[in-house]
Amino acid sequence: MKYDIVLFDLDGTLLNTLEDLADSVNYVMMQMGYPVHPLESIRQFVGNGIRILMVKATPQGEENPRFEEAFAMFKAYYLTHNQIETRPYDGVMELLHDYEEQDMPMAIVTNKNQESVDVLVRDVFKNHVRVAVGDDGIRPRKPAAAPVEEALRRLRQVYADRSWARMGVEDALSEEDWLEWIKPHVLYVGDSDVDAATAENSGVDCALCAWGFREESLLETLPHVVLLHKPLELEAFVRG
């Protein structure tokens, strides 16, 4: 195997969430009397978490005196409307099923708020993915390395019997040293410039997927080890 661990972005990588995000944004815009946004504008707004999404969507952003009201309205509405049109991309469920059958360590690392992540992992993926790190409002968001490193720490606990998880236990290797040791064995899969920067900042390899929210022409300019056009292409690449 070329990699021991696979990490996935969520929106635009595993799930097509664009329409539900757009509908939720525009619900808030209409409720507050602001202009609505076309789907393609929302596509460009996503990637840095829902607060940044709403900063970009709300006139004057955080300078708007009603911004916090708009943001709270979005969070409440989206939490109960995040599975209307949201679907896994073709081939994603088969890929996750195959990896689960192989007991392949995998995790989700996303800027989506943790509450929504937990709901989607439970309802869409039926908890096939055992570790999912979202935005908890405390830890730095992607493209910082912190979410990736948190996912790796949790995977080490979940897969404590693996040789790579046990590495350093006997000789008291520090957690920081273990993270640096494991990173060459990790692949991060995403669909955007944020994901490429996350992988680079985290010191792990990046696979980019062309079926997501960004144009392939942009993806080709970003640092990556492979550009995927179908989810199942990932299996062959990871196997080497």
Question: Which residue stretches match the model-derived regions?
Answer:
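Active-site neighborhood of HAD-like aspartate-dependent phosphohydrolases
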Residues: 1-44
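Core-facing hydrophobic residues within beta-strands of well-ordered domains
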Residues: 3, 128-129, 183
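Substrate-recognition/cap helix-loop segment adjacent to the acidic, metal-dependent catalytic center
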Residues: 30-32, 53-61, 85, 93, ...
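A metal-dependent, Asp-based hydrolase signature
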Residues: 48-80, 90, 97-98
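Structural recognition of alpha->loop->beta junctions
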Residues: 125-134, 219-234
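Conserved Lys-Pro-Asp/Glu-containing loop-to-beta segment of HAD-superfamily phosphomonoesterases
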Residues: 143-196
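Acidic, Mg2+-coordinating phosphoryl-transfer loop and its flanking beta/alpha structural elements
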Residues: 188-227
